[in-house]
């Protein structure tokens, strides 16, 4: 006897936009008019690689009529959020549940963990001592750095077996020095994404006062400062052959070539906007939905920030560290959806300990992982009305592609014509950026003469 298509695919709907703290009982109440197969066992939540709720779930129903009833709940609200309901099937459900969450094949059986919250200047020896008694494979430790060669506060460690990695996870929230360390399951694929630097962002880096533009070959004309040179020489802290095991990144970053990053999207939370610190943040969002915080107490921890946004559940928190190794009082917080980022803005001007905290939205509806194109970047940096220090304000910036013109906001005689691309919306208050460009422009023009 042949099963019908519906019988083979089941009666499944996918739900998106659930509150982070949502339980199976709450989903049952949301679908109270529908008959869910096996009760709460028919509700399958989707989790991130770190084991956090993704805000999505599959719901198995008893018949096609129940599916139709469930679809009528689309765009109804649960708490303060509206919930989307889509028709799905058991094939999609099985595949997604198998390939997501902390126990997916992408994260299992390779022995990787990711550490977050390391003290500034933490060495590999300190990490080895932290995991004393647990065998780490040779060259199995990676300490990523940002574009200025500074530690990001994260590390990847590969243990000799998955069983040892599981033991390492039990040290979650233990301390190195005065900092408690968060430990998450990771994978070789995640390590690769940290090894492949955001090349488009390199092209956007502010030139130093002694950097000189190249011969006007698109991205190749961007000055390469000392921080970039440190990273180009393998300043990721060793391990895995200095990129070579992951595709030979030591051969160069593809300046002026087609290798110039067409595969990754990033949400910029820094740039030269001095409201975001000096010259940009090392934070790179994978969702494109971020909120920037300013005015944090200097003793604030990542856990304090998670609690600040409760009941929302941020995916990631990045506390900025200044060149002197001290916290700047600013942080970037990544959310899974634009709706969550907008909801988080309700906390603007709320107090954390003895200080009120300012929030700046860096998210647009319908984006995921930034707003990249092969040839241009559009950044939407929205600030609250009257906020000071915003070089870009709420202007839209477009450009930075391969172009023969630039529009950094000065007179035409002061603008570069060698391939910077341009497109800062006519802003001229770029925290010294114009002056540097003018100096570089005069050097560049004298070389051509």
Swiss-Prot record:
The processes (GO biological process) annotated in the record are:
regulation of RNA splicing
Query: Where is region (2 X 19 AA perfect repeats) located?
Result: 354-392
Q: Give a yes or no for keyword Cell division in this entry.
A: no
Which positions does the record annotate as the modified residue Omega-N-methylarginine? 233
Q: Which UniProt keywords apply?
A: Acetylation, Isopeptide bond, Methylation, Nucleus, Phosphoprotein, Repeat, Ribonucleoprotein, RNA-binding, Ubl conjugation
Please give the residue positions where the record annotates the modification Dimethylated arginine: 233
Q: Tell me which residues bear Phosphotyrosine.
A: 246
Where, subcellularly, is it found?
A: Nucleus, Nucleoplasm
Q: Which gene encodes it?
A: HNRNPH2
- Which residues are in the RRM domain? 11-90, 111-188, 289-364
What protein name applies here? Heterogeneous nuclear ribonucleoprotein H2
| Any one GO cellular component localisation term in the record | ribonucleoprotein complex
Keyword Repeat assigned to the entry: answer is: yes
Phosphoserine modified-residue sites? 23, 54, 63, 90, 310
